[in-house]
Amino acid sequence: IVVTNPPEKESTQLYVTQKDEFTMSQKENFVILVLDCFDSREFTELLSEHPEYRETFADFTYFENMTAAYSCTKRSIPFILGGDWYENQGSFTEYMNGVYSGSPLFTALKERGYLIDLYEDELYTWDENALSDFDNIIIANYYVNSWIRLAKQELKLVGFRYAPFDLKRFCVTKKSGFDEEILVDCGYKGFNSENYYFKGDLEDNEIVMDDTQKRFKFIHLVGAHTPFIYDSDCNIIDIKDGTYKQNAEASITLAAMYIDALKKSGAYDDTAL
């Protein structure tokens, strides 16, 4: 192990908060709820197996033959937001800055008086100007909770590649392990795209309505993405017992919970989802 001087790092960074995630406008609301890696073919099969799903999504239009623009999340989300292909002309960060600052969607929303919230784990840029239009993304002070525990997480991350094969099973890391060691001083909880966080927050917080301007929310959740750690009710299970289908059913459970919460709040009829 090589010991070096502490890293020089800015103590302030852009921070995606949960601010107003469950606050809707009494006027108009526009919500895009992304359930990652949810294949339309799987949804079609689930509709045939579970007729009750048709009742849950009775007010929605389903295009069975839809195909994503990209096969990976990193490219797909920017395309959804901005509509422009990334063709390796310039850095990806420059491309993302253009998506955030020049998206026809965001431009139209601002012209129509919408308050814009972006609940997304990965921003792929730290340009404050490019992200200045998003109400829930703020500049916050960061602190390390424990340098020792953070170093352990980093060693496990490195070990997953370089450790002998028999030891790799002890080197599994999760993003949450790093998140726990980074404290943020801003007065808001940070957004987390994991399904169980969204489910817990929905159970703990009612959707409320206010009389502010119209609201737009882009909420990107893990959905059916690996690892397969959910049962159909979105409870965490042993990864050995998980399947893609169960993750997909868990995603439907989340969507149904969100729709139900919107209906209970009275915001459903004034929300395009």
Feature-to-residue mapping (PLM):
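A solvent-exposed, charged loop/short amphipathic helix patch at secondary-structure junctions
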Residues: 231-251
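Metal-dependent active-site segment of extracytoplasmic phospho-/sulfohydrolases and closely related
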Residues: 31, 52, 250-273
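Surface-exposed acidic, glycine-flexible loop patches that form ligand/cofactor-binding
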Residues: 23-24, 207-210, 261-268
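Active-site-proximal alpha/beta segments of enzymes that process anionic O-linked groups
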Residues: 28, 37-235
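Transmembrane and membrane-interface helices of multi-pass
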Residues: 1-9
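Short extracytoplasmic/periplasmic juxtamembrane "stem" segments immediately C-terminal to an N-terminal membrane anchor
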Residues: 11-30
